[in-house]
Amino acid sequence: MTALFQQLPSVDKILKTSQGSQLITEFGHTAVVAICRELLTQARQFIKKNNQLPEYFSNFDRTFVEIHSRLQKQNQVQIKAVHNLTGTVLHTNLGRALWSEAAQQAALSVMQKNVSLEYDLDEGKRSHRDNYISELLCKLTGAEAACIVNNNAAAVLLMLATFAQGKEVIISRGELIEIGGAFRIPDIMEQAGCHLVEVGTTNRTHLKDYRNAITENTAFLMKVHSSNYQICGFTSSVSEEELAELGREMNVPVVTDLGSGALIDLSQYGLPKESTVQEKVAQGVGLVSFSGDKLLGGVQAGIIVGKKEWIEQLQAHPLKRALRCDKVILAGLEATLRLYLNPEKLTEKLPTLYLLTQPLKQLKINAMRLKERLESRLNSQFDIQIEASQAQIGSGSQPMERIPSVAVTIAEKTNVKLSALSARFKQLSQPIIGRMENGKIWLDLRSLAAIETLLNTLDEL
C-alpha cells in the first residue's frame, strides 16, 4: 500500500508540467491547486479502501482530464436555464413568472448605471425608493398608496408586525393556510408577535363569527387567499365586501392576503376567473397584499396597496428597510406594471399571459414538431404520441382549475427505461423538465417558452 501512495504525484509536480501550466492559465492558480489537493485526498482514501490506484491516476493524461473536468464543472453556473414542459406555467421550483422583454431591459439598464433610485430629480433631494411604483400601482388599482417588499410572505409579516404586535388578528379557520416550504399563516403571526383568533369552522364561517370575536384588543380582520387548495361542498365564507362593512361599523381595519395578485380579469381570455386587486380595493379593504411573480407576471416582490395613512405606517416600520427591494427588482417591477397601461397588448408583451392564452392550434403545431424531432433522435426506442393534456396556472393560482393543452407523451416499448431517458433530458445543456403520469413522460407544450430553443437542445441527444 505504501508503494501505491508513493505513486501519487505531488501538487507541485502537477503544476510544473505543461498541462498544469495550461490549467493555471485557463482557471487560475488558486482554483487548480484546490482541485489537485481535493483529488489527491480522495485518491488516498480510495487506496486505503481498495488497495489500488483510482483510474484517473493510472497515467498523467487521465489525471489532467479529471482535473480539467472538475475545474469546468466548478465554473458552471448551478442555477441553469431549463425547458419547462411540466404543464405548470407558474412553476415555483422553476422560477415562476418569466420576465417580459421590457422588464429585462429595465433591469439591465439599472445594473449598468447609477439611477435615481432614492433621488427626486425635480426637487434635487432624497426621495423614497417606492415612490415611482407607488404612483403607478395607485393608477392601476385605485388604491391611495403602495409599499413594496421582497415577497408576499414579507408583506404579510410587515402588516402584522406594524399593526398587530401584542394584539389579536381574527381569521377564519378555513383560511389558516400552509403553502410550499412549510409557510404557515399561524407561524407568521407568531413571528410578528400577534395573537391568532380563529373563527368559524373549517368549511363554514359566517359574518356573526367575526362580529362576536371582536374585542378592544382586535388589531384587524384578515382574509387569506386559499392558495393551493379549495374547500368544496357544504361551505360558507364571508366576502371582503361584507367584512369591510363590518369593519367600518366596528371601527376595525380589514386586511387581505390576496396571494396571486391578478390586475386584470382573466375570464376575458377564457381562463378561470380570479379576484383582482382592484375589486378588493373597491370593496373597502384597508390593505391588500399580493405577489409580483405570479399572475402579475413579473419579478418576485410583495406588494401592498391600500389606505395612505396605513401605508405610511408600514413604510416607517424598522422591518421595512430589512425587507425592501433593490434597484434591479424595482426596475423590473415598474416595467412590468407599465405594460398594464396598455392592456390590449398584454398577451403579446407579458410572457405569463402569452403562455396561458396560446391557442390549441399553435400548441398542436409545436407538438408535431417536437414529436418529429424526438422520433429522429430516439430511433424508435420509445412510443411517442401527441395527446390532449390539462395544464394549470400554478403557484397556488386556481389550484382546482385546468387549462386545455397539448402534450407529447413518451412510453416504453423496448428495454430502454423511461427513467434513463428522463435522466438524459436533465443532463442536456438546457435540461428538459416534464412530468411523469400514467407510466409516461408528458411534455406539455402549454408551459414551454421557446419551441425553437427546445428543438435545438434535442439535437444533443
Swiss-Prot record:
Needed co-factor(s): pyridoxal 5'-phosphate
GO molecular function, one term: L-seryl-tRNA(Sec) selenium transferase activity
Residues annotated with N6-(pyridoxal phosphate)lysine modification: K294
Gene3D superfamilies in the cross-refs: 3.90.1150.180, Type I PLP-dependent aspartate aminotransferase-like (Major domain)
Record-linked SUPFAM superfamilies: PLP-dependent transferases (SSF53383)
Any one GO cellular component localisation term in the record: cytoplasm
Signal peptide range in chain numbering: none
Pathway linked to the protein: Aminoacyl-tRNA biosynthesis; selenocysteinyl-tRNA(Sec) biosynthesis; selenocysteinyl-tRNA(Sec) from L-seryl-tRNA(Sec) (bacterial route): step 1/1
Protein role: Converts seryl-tRNA(Sec) to selenocysteinyl-tRNA(Sec) required for selenoprotein biosynthesis.
UniProt record similarity statement: Belongs to the SelA family.
Protein name: L-seryl-tRNA(Sec) selenium transferase
